Amino acid sequence: MHYSEEDIENLEKVFRINLINSCSGYKSANLIGSTSKTGINNLAIFSSITHLGSNPPLLGFFLRPTEIVPRHTYLNIKDNPYYTINSVQSEFVDKAHHTSAKYDREVSEFDITKIEPEYINNFPAPFVKSSSVKIGMKFVEEIKINYNKSRLIVGKIVELNIDDHLISVDGFINLSDAEVATISGCDGYSFPASNSRKGYQKPQKS
């Protein structure tokens, strides 16, 4: 099936959303935990988290325009620069997906979904207790994308909590062993079953 630029612009809204969200392939599924200035814990699923560098250790995630729809995660991070990124496992993927529902800011998705929060080392934002990979983040900067008014939120990793058996001797995290979810589109969840690791590549000698 071929879609021209004009075809894409004229697609039915939901079809276009699903098509464009899934055409780039699988994305990580993560829950971001944050706390409002009034102490309400927020939990929201994201599929846009990306690695930005290892030294310093930076992760970013994208937000749709904040001027149109309130983004509680964004508002909380502006009030409290600490937040968490947590893996999603098969046993609670349904609960994790429900955090995409648009509740009022004073409602905690932890309470609604019965996902248990966890506080580690006095970190000022809640982790997800059931997650195998828990990342403590501190907000660094935001970059506005003028073309569609989205924002890239950049944070620094300040704490890592990972199940011991998932970490290889070289630092690789075997997410397959924990049945960590990926997302295709907006609502298609998959669980990679194996890893195929390749060595560091150098130019071939002629």
Residue ranges: model-predicted function:
Residues 1-206:
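Basic, polyanion-binding surface patches
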